[in-house]
Amino acid sequence: MSPRRTVSLITLGCARNEVDSEELAGRLAADGWTLVDADDGEKADVVIVNTCGFIQAAKEDSIETLLNAAEGGARVVAAGCLAERYGAELAEAMPEAQVISFDDYAHISERLEDVLAGRPLTPHTPRDRRTLLPITPVDRSQAAKNHVPGHLTFGEEITPLPDGVAPASGPTIPRLRLTGGPVANLKIASGCDRRCSFCAIPSFRGAYLSRKPEDVLREAEWLAGQGVRELFLVSENSTSYGKDLGDVRALEKLLPRLAAIPGIERVRVSYLQPAEVRPGLIDVLTGTPGVVPYFDLSFQHASGPLLRRMRRFGDRERFLELVARIRAKAPEAGIRSNFIVGFPGETDEDFAELVAFLEQARLDAIGIFGYSDEDGTEAAGFDGKLPEETIKERVDQLNQLAEELMAQRAEERIGSTIDVLVEDVLDDGAYEGRAAHQAPEVDGSTILYADTALHVGDIVPATVLTAMGVDLVAEHQEDADTT
């Protein structure tokens, strides 16, 4: 009998990383590893830290987490974006951890066996992963099987599978949910073909690659069988979904099919590029039962000249027109976006354009980030860098404005009826959940009061009583239907 081998996973960064961690967990569980939860005080033989390498703060958090994991005495493996981006350089700087690449995910059990046996792994030399797939999008699918997490198809099903592990006939890879609850991330694509001057993600996440609709649907059906009520579709750019499959309207066709899966009550889409949001997509997002009218729009700024310097499209007028089109279809729609402040060359006039846009757009959720140079990006070589104190002042000013604007938008919902997905039962007998305009973790939540007992996973109608910043307080409508 094989000795018990234990592993724990720590996930940092975005929802896409969470899906990758569940892929790793599924592979390991299928190969006989026991997953343990470090938060419960259980010690693992190996700790995998799925790192984030997006911005400097995320890199620092990843390094600190790796060091903390090593202090516990376990063997530590660095996976994810920081590991992929820096490879051998990270391994040399951090002897406390072994470093693996995305290319190692298909062989993760073998890599951990080597780590347990004391055999050092050979760290990879980073390369631009956009070069691993054909330039023509429609030629990428077959080549992706060896290079992109979440896109491998097994030759045969792994049997028997541990409880809770999705079979290869569902998702294209085994997946083990690491968190319970009624919401799950569902990856529809990987990589990005855009060349934004500030962003390094395409270089280590690779070229854009859509998952086949049939694979996405099978995984969604499996998630529904696990008790999931809301699907959160994730990718680096969801509006490009299907372009490499020969169908630029593939997302518009996929969404109604996902919403029709028994047990799935909500489908939410993340990360939409404003320049790619077609009228037909707006119609589907605002008019399909089960698809929430939620728009995670990547504006990044509102000054036309500065956006062009970022290698992006649009300006304040065009973005306001897009917001107006959405709200004309669905006044209750949730709209969120992130913005970069202090990009090289940002003038007082550029900054004023952004302020004016925020004041006029009345977004539901706003994220503000100060610009910092990223290794290997075009913008790192730009002139016109702003002093750090100027960037900080502008970030502070916009954060204050954003808090005021988000609070005002939340207050506009007082008295309205919302549908709340119950996610937690609080100690005082109240419930916490989210309305349709609130995405997991980033857009606030709703505190719900009810005279009758509710359960996690219920979706109930409620009247908004008040707002606390972006958060809402609501009362269950007892005489209405609960789903």
From Swiss-Prot:
Record's keyword terms, sorted: 4Fe-4S, Cytoplasm, Iron, Iron-sulfur, Metal-binding, S-adenosyl-L-methionine, Transferase
The protein, known as: Ribosomal protein uS12 methylthiotransferase RimO
Cofactor: [4Fe-4S] cluster
GO cellular component: cytosol
Compartment list: Cytoplasm
GO molecular function: 4 iron, 4 sulfur cluster binding; aspartic acid methylthiotransferase activity; metal ion binding; protein methylthiotransferase activity
Ranges of residues in domain MTTase N-terminal: 5-117
PANTHER family noted in UniProt: RIBOSOMAL PROTEIN S12 METHYLTHIOTRANSFERASE RIMO (PTHR43837), RIBOSOMAL PROTEIN US12 METHYLTHIOTRANSFERASE RIMO (PTHR43837:SF1)
Cytoplasm is among the record's keywords: yes
Main location: cytoplasm
EC number(s) per entry: 2.8.4.4
Family annotation (InterPro entries): Elp3/MiaA/NifB-like_rSAM, Methylthiotransferase, Methylthiotransferase_CS, Methylthiotransferase_N, Methylthiotransferase_N_sf, NA-bd_OB-fold, Ribosomal_uS12_MeSTrfase_RimO, rSAM
Residues annotated as binding [4Fe-4S] cluster 2: C192, C196, C199
Gene3D superfamilies, per database record: Methylthiotransferase, N-terminal domain, Nucleic acid-binding proteins, tm_1862 like domain
Binding site for [4Fe-4S] cluster 1: C14, C52, C81
Gene Ontology biological process terms from the UniProt entry: tRNA modification
Boundaries of every TRAM domain copy: 411-478
Top-level EC class: transferase
Function as written in the Swiss-Prot or TrEMBL entry: Catalyzes the methylthiolation of an aspartic acid residue of ribosomal protein uS12.
